Amino acid sequence: MNFEEIEERDGVRFTWNVFPSTRIESSRTIVPIASIYKPLNERPDLPPVLYEPVTCKAPCKAVLNPYCHIDTRAKFWICPFCLQRNMLPPQYKDISNTSLPIELLPEYSTIEYTLPRPPQLTPVFLFVVDVCQDEENLQALKDSLIISLSLLPPECLVGLVTFGTMVDVYELGYTECSKSYVFRGSKDYTSKQIQEMLGLPTSNVSPVALQQARSFQGSAAPSRFLLPIQQCEFQLTNILEQLQPDSWPVANDRRPQRCTGTALNISVSMMESVCPNSGGHIMLFAGGPSTVGPGTVVSTELREPIRSHHDIERDQAKHVKKALRFYEGLTKRVSANGHAVDILAGCLDQIGIMEMKSLASSTGGYLVLSDSFTTSIFKQSFQRIFGRDSLNNMLLGFNATMEVLTTKELKISGLIGHAVSLNKKSQNVGDIEIGLGNTNSWKMCGISPKSTYAIYFEVATQSASAPQGDSRGLVQYLTLYQHSSNTFRLRVTTVARAFADGGSPLIVNSFDQEAAAVAMARIAAFKAEVDDGPDVLRWTDRMLIKLCQKFAEYRKDDPSSFRLSSQFTLYPQFMYYLRRSPFLQVFNNSPDETAFYRHMLNHEDVNNSLIMIQPTLQSFSFEHPGGVPVLLDAVSVKPDVILLLDTFFHILIFHGDTIAQWRNAGYQNQPEYQNLKELLEAPRVEAAELLIDRFPIPRFIVCDQGGSQARFLLSRLNPSETHNTTSMYGAPPAHAILTDDVSLQTFMSHLKKLAVAVS
């Protein structure tokens, strides 16, 4: 079974591709049945389907698919999910076994309907800009914002809010001069107060009335702050060009007064009044931490350091709990109205992403960490948000909902990904809760072709009524979203997997160890948000030991007899590198960095997630000038090679000692050493290819053996050779790693002993 081919067609990978037939047998497989699903998986071969889907009767509402039984003579179909009989609509009167509509063809198990009813409002982009920055940083941000106006569709609505000590809401409909409404940054305003001060309706205005109001040239209140780009581009560009750093004086021993929380509160209040239940992005550009008003993460006094993991663990971070409550309250409001929040940081210090993470993670917003708005990491990442497809449509999707239907043998445990629960109960909701559980429907305010969700299942069948023979379980994913072309799209994916008895080799052979590693990594990262780090590591180890006890071949109490089949051989090393990854190890990372890493793990597909868990390493040498994959191990560090490390977040080129000396001597500039010049260039060419579709842009590092930046490589290598390892004559190896971490070899040795031990 080629898992990657299935992923290309349907955007889905299951941990097990043959399901155990009973609940008890399923619990014994240790790794839960889970699908890593990419709803907007790019399928250039999908033909446009410009009509409403045929659905089953309520409450089922499953969509017609290739697994339905069709009676072409009597013109009815039987739903495989509820077994109800449904008549085909009149337009299907000419259907026959040789002339089937596209949704019934086996190769179109994934199909996308373009629905005839358009959204009432075009997508909205509200820029929330921090002006507490130095002039160079602010100028770079202004330039990027002006460029972005040309990347957005001209009919999109845009707005501008700036903040420092005060918050300014700009009235783009006023063209005589730059006009803004000013709010005090230290005050906690209610939604009603903000809407009244801005002259906005305090109750949800109907989208139809809003559309009519927009026809007036700025006379209607809702249209003053959010206007189509084609109507306000000149005015907005002028305002951006005139923005100046915050003029409020800052003492030498103080931080600037930055009211990020108040600015976000005002932005959310404005959006929920002007464009409720409509697609949109609130894009926060923060140049530092919030220091005043609601959502403060650190005081203005420089003698008070911003919180660390150590402070949070010891309950010594005095602002954290209050800030978390505030931002989680904003998250509930913004997600209820279908708006995503993007957080783009341009600061060497932390800005409070740990406190604000729910705003992005629960709404499907983007997170970008950069040292400054002048860096290419920010500039290129920001522009990639507005990327286009082959038809010149923005890749962004808005205000999506996903419903998962299953046949009666399966129930849903939950979802882990960038979504919020719609709290919709149905008969296929299971008892076990993993992630966002107790529902079969979720909302994703922001969604893109890269957005990936882990959905967890349980087998509902008791042993007495186990499925017989060639029975199979069906799962249907229904994703409704607002497309950037201002149409509603419904993406439908229907997949089937067979059931087998618990001891069947079919189950073992169907294990997708890569998808399983990612599914378990998401659970571990989810647990790490609420549990202590050591507890999560112990849980990860327990699950691995149990899996090996169940599926390995061994003799009791004989570690040398331990064998794993080819379907399981990579899984233990994935778990080893997961234990050492920044998702579970917070040492040497700030709370903001940890929040960012976990956010990205919950967004990317299987292949990219595996790069995050176990980075890839390539070696370039005179024997292999084109580069070859090598072990992520200390033995790969040699003086005469160049290494290229890809951790997803960093791309690092590491020059061995000898290569670095030759380069520093300038040999590559001499004609007779052309091969050295080509060798030095080869990793850079490979790195450029890795950057083509990566988001956000990774940090690019070039270093030499023994240099300070080499720590980024050494920290991710398996420490098979450390300062405690002796080579010839008792001396440590030349490339020893100074660490007390256990090596992969020691880890596997302990795993074998524990797995074969008599319980």
Swiss-Prot record:
This is Protein transport protein sec23-1. It holds the Pfam family Sec23_BS. One of its GO terms (biological process) is intracellular protein transport. PANTHER family: PROTEIN TRANSPORT PROTEIN SEC23, PROTEIN TRANSPORT PROTEIN SEC23-1. It comes from the Eukaryota. It is a peripheral membrane protein. The gene is sec231. It is found in: Cytoplasm; Cytoplasmic vesicle, COPII-coated vesicle membrane; Endoplasmic reticulum membrane; Golgi apparatus membrane. GO terms for cellular component: COPII vesicle coat; endoplasmic reticulum exit site; endoplasmic reticulum membrane; Golgi membrane. Zn(2+) binds at C56, C60, C79, C82. GO terms for molecular function: GTPase activator activity; zinc ion binding. Belongs to the SEC23/SEC24 family. SEC23 subfamily. The COPII coat is composed of at least 5 proteins: the sec23/24 complex, the sec13/31 complex, and the protein sar1. Keywords: Cytoplasm, Cytoplasmic vesicle, Endoplasmic reticulum, ER-Golgi transport, Golgi apparatus, Membrane, Metal-binding, Protein transport, Transport, Zinc. Component of the coat protein complex II (COPII) which promotes the formation of transport vesicles from the endoplasmic reticulum (ER). The coat has two main functions, the physical deformation of the endoplasmic reticulum membrane into vesicles and the selection of cargo molecules. The keyword Zinc applies.
